[in-house]
Amino acid sequence: MPVHGAIDFVVFIPDFQLSTEKARAALPKRIDHHDAVYNLARAALLAGSLTTGKLENLDVATGDCLHQPYRFSLIENGEDIVREAKELGALGAFISGAGPSIVAIVYKGDRDYIEKAQALCESKYPHWKAVQLRCDEVGTTVKRL
């Protein structure tokens, strides 16, 4: 899926690990139909927003009720990091996969954001660090040798 080139990612990485097995065990065995529809609609909005560049939709599109509410209890300061990442100006923020890292979507080349994120970690969350990653719009390629 080609991603609109106006974004980068800031990843908040804690100094602890969370096993996928433990993260999966935190999830309920069954989900409510309403919750499934909620997440499916947001997944479609996320894909559409990332490909069209409608970045104003990313906060809503990164909303979740299937795994984040259950996994935040396993990620010390995780919910606070997501909230504060948005307060710093992230377009959206969420748990990366099973966790424990948190991903914030930011405007491409926003040096102010990464500086503020690093300062936030140093001052309030010393067990976390913030790292800026570029969006790879090509993905893995295989070339003939």
Each language-model region and where it sits:
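Solvent-exposed alpha-helices and their adjacent loops that cap or buttress functional pockets
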Residues: M1-G5, Y38-N39, K86-E87, F94-S96
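Glycine-rich, charge-dense phosphate/pyrophosphate-binding loop(s)
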Residues: L50-L145
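Residues embedded in well-ordered beta-strands
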Residues: F9-V10, S101
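Active-site rim beta-loop-alpha module in soluble metabolic enzymes
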Residues: V10-S73
